[in-house]
Amino acid sequence: MHAKKQFRRRPLVDRECGSMLIELLIAMVVLAIGLGGILVLLVASIYTNNTAGKDTTSTMIAEHVLEQISAQPANAVSSLTLTDCAGTGWSINTVGASQGTGSGGSHGGNGANLTTTGIIDWTESYAAVPANYAMKYTACGAGGKQIVYDIRWDILTMSNYSRMIVVSARPSGSPVVGGVRYIIPPNMRTIGGM
């Protein structure tokens, strides 16, 4: 007789037991970090989209003021009046001065200070800009929303028959430098003559 060998099956021990749970946990952590990063980018992009609209309006308002001033003869001494969306009539002084001899600092004529590169110096406070060379213009927006813009200009007399006009605008309350809320103020210039 043959003795039968009985083989007993040993239960298989699953050495990978629980590894799926660990993989799932790692995947969830990676996903949470990724979604957190995307959320920050999404919020920043929504905010900068709104900022782009304000930036475009700043350019449009600066161009409007520039056109109003340049439409006057270079030797005109009378002020203009510009009415904003709030019904405020702003007086615009168009009298210029030679470089360094007016109220615009050593690089400007009359008006807001200019930097060494010939752009409006936004570090100068609004109150320090001479009267009628700056305004807090209220622009009409969609749905009756109004935004106030800080507009400044400087007029350099080049000769008896010509002058250079520099105009800049930005939303009131925007930071002077850096950050998500920063809007680069457009600086527009033209030569106006007789």
Question: PLM features: residue spans?
Answer:
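N-terminal leader/signal peptides at the extreme start of proteins
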Residues: 1-19
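General helical secondary-structure elements
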Residues: 4-6, 50, 159, 185
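Short secondary-structure boundary micro-motifs
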Residues: 7, 13, 32-34, 42-43, ...
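Aliphatic-rich helix starts adjacent to a transmembrane/signal segment
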Residues: 19-63
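Low-complexity, Gly/Pro-rich coil/beta segments used as flexible assembly/activation regions
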Residues: 56, 60-194
